[in-house]
């Protein structure tokens, strides 16, 4: 279990993360959803001890996480947004190097590499040099590298950033399969459809603060599962209703170009935070 208590990070007079409180249960897939600059990466950086908090603390199974907390740190791995690998290495060499950092035996490294590459669909590419990989393959390799030491917690910072639609959906399939590995996962993203498709719960973050934390379905139900859209003065106006019947009744009162549709997580975010995030 991860407990984030009063977590704050300041850079001079600028507060990047502002008194966050959150509990992530064991084996939960948690999404941290917000626009660029909202504080997502700063939060991940503190959880990976790259940055130290100005205030507050992070607990991993009750143990405070810091740069000296060896037991807690061994429980987690991070997949950063940047491609943090030597470009002249082969994929097999990347995995071997990671294994040696953790004093794994050669036989163990080889077996684990084979298992993870099969899991990620990379089995036939082990001898390919990193610089020749697509962005999607690099991210898959980074996930395999992060899983090399069998962590209990996986931190994923914008894992589909820069991918085209097909590559993103393929990555989603891989991320869904991580649920079968008994991992606690924290995913940061600015793609609303990604959070809705993958996460058990989502936390909206904006300006370094949490706005709301709940399941995607519960958030949609709170706003109203049915929406009616109408274009007024070249602006899309949306209204939300608790039942389909109520939405249809409103629809009858509007011009013919009004549209009935299902409410999405994006609608919830726009209503709560006031930002229009990137559509998938």
Language-model features: where?
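Conserved ABC transporter NBD signature motif
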Residues: 56-67, 71-72
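Catalytic Walker B motif of ABC-type/P-loop ATPase nucleotide-binding domains
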Residues: 154-157
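Conserved ABC ATPase signature
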Residues: 129-133
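Conserved ABC ATPase "signature" region
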Residues: 96, 100, 107-125
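Conserved catalytic motifs of ABC-family nucleotide-binding domains
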Residues: 150
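ABC transporter nucleotide-binding domain
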Residues: 170-247
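Hydrophobic anchor residue at the start of the ABC signature
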Residues: 143
